[in-house]
Amino acid sequence: MQKTSIPDFQITAKVVYVPSESRPDEGYHFFAYKITITNTGSTPAQLMSRHWVITDALGKKEEVRGPGVVGLQPKIQPGQTFEYDSACPLTTSTGSMVGRYFFVGESGESFSVEVPEFYLIAPLALH
């Protein structure tokens, strides 16, 4: 009997509002975020592409698809963490992002991992 190893990943996001890059009076809010991807499984896998759905406070959705992340297609070994920084402008002071990363495992199998929804909230939106 052959045992199959299913890759397992934990993904977290940290968001920061960037006031120096934002122009709230003009409807431009700039958010920076750091994504941490940890391979908690027992097999390596390579991140091949991404798909994001970005939603603003008015319900307007924008989809972003592309190869890798920040120009890279990292191979993430078991126990290894890969982090990257990116950014997202919005026309509203709040919004959210949710997505999916598409990987290829060491045996050539393709699979995807959901990026849990995270929120983009300008400090001024809380007052």
Swiss-Prot record:
The source's superkingdom equals Bacteria
Gene3D superfamilies named in the record: ApaG domain (2.60.40.1470)
- Pfam families with a match to the protein in the record: DUF525
Q: InterPro entries per the record?
A: ApaG-like, ApaG_domain, ApaG_sf, Uncharacterised_ApaG
**Residue ranges of domain ApaG in the record:** 3-127
PANTHER family per the UniProt record, alphabetical: OS05G0170800 PROTEIN
Protein name (Swiss-Prot/TrEMBL): Protein ApaG
Q: Which gene encodes it?
A: apaG
